[in-house]
Amino acid sequence: MSFSNEMKVFSGNANRPLAEKIANYLNLQLGDCEVGRFADGEINVRINETVRGHDIFLIQPTSPPVNENLMELLIMIDAFKRASANTIAVVIPYYGYARQDRKAKGRDPISAKLVANLITVAGATRVLTVDLHAEQIQGFFDIPVDNLWSYPVFAEELLKRENIVPEETVVVSPDVGGVRRARRMAERLGTSLAILDKRRPSDNVAEVVNIIGEVEDKVVIMFDDIIDTAHSIVKGAEALKNAGAKRIIACATHGVFSDRALERIENSSIDTVYITDTIYHENLPEKVKVISVANLIGEAIMRIRKHLSVSTLFR
């Protein structure tokens, strides 16, 4: 006797609008699951439909408030495991704690590894995420991890909205660590590549020391994975403007926007900022545009479900 395991998609509270778009792409309704709080603030998860023997895709970015959303995710995984789900694939569009992926100095924790351990022990059987800050985090897990790249989504949108002339445009990596990410975008758009050489005197503070590449009289596309406080991207834009950049467009997968980041962006040399909807925001300024990665994630889920290649999405 053979059984076809039904697929169901559920969402926590972190980014329900994105989860609804993903479910819509898959021609599914979001599963009925309540994630609330007890009187003392503890998280309460109630699954209101059967999931026994089903393949579950659970959508929950661990964005700010990071600890609240992470605990929601862990408790939801545990609830589905104890309800006898066949598989539990967690879709974490934004992976919190990803920047704590190594010991930068003595006695530092490696929190990204701890989070990976927690997700695995809770009962996840697969992880799907978007633009991990450090791709080696995939190796922190002993379960399959699919790290989706957002650059095709950005490239398609930029070609639609901006007058991109490859010979007059340059993609800029905001630091040496982001060169591979920026190179993918440059190859997609057919542009040249430049790099900002930065130094970090302290956390969330960066100083541009040198610009490697030609940016004078060019439209600059700064491409990064995260905008947090926006100190780095604003300082970078200022250096590029001083070097003769004609126009500055910033693209970042994850708009965290901590500590007056939006105010800094509004008052900066950046003309337009593009982010994705991995993190939910309301009432963003006119300068900030949101591109959805729902179809990208939805297609990846469909391919995983059908045992098809995910990597061919980026060829």
Swiss-Prot record:
An example Gene Ontology molecular-function term: ATP binding
Record localization: Cytoplasm
Active-site residues annotated for this sequence: K198
Cofactor(s) annotated in UniProt: Mg(2+)
Catalytic activity, EC: 2.7.6.1
Cofactor comment text: Binds 2 Mg(2+) ions per subunit.
Binding-site positions, D-ribose 5-phosphate: R200, D224, D228, T229, A230, H231, S232
Spans through the membrane: none
Record family assignment: Belongs to the ribose-phosphate pyrophosphokinase family. Class I subfamily.
PANTHER family the UniProt entry points to: RIBOSE-PHOSPHATE DIPHOSPHOKINASE FAMILY MEMBER (PTHR10210), RIBOSE-PHOSPHATE PYROPHOSPHOKINASE 1, CHLOROPLASTIC (PTHR10210:SF41)
Known role: Involved in the biosynthesis of the central metabolite phospho-alpha-D-ribosyl-1-pyrophosphate (PRPP) via the transfer of pyrophosphoryl group from ATP to 1-hydroxyl of ribose-5-phosphate (Rib-5-P).
Subunit: Homohexamer.
Listed name of the protein: Ribose-phosphate pyrophosphokinase
Organism (species): Thermotoga maritima (strain ATCC 43589 / DSM 3109 / JCM 10099 / NBRC 100826 / MSB8)
Gene: prs
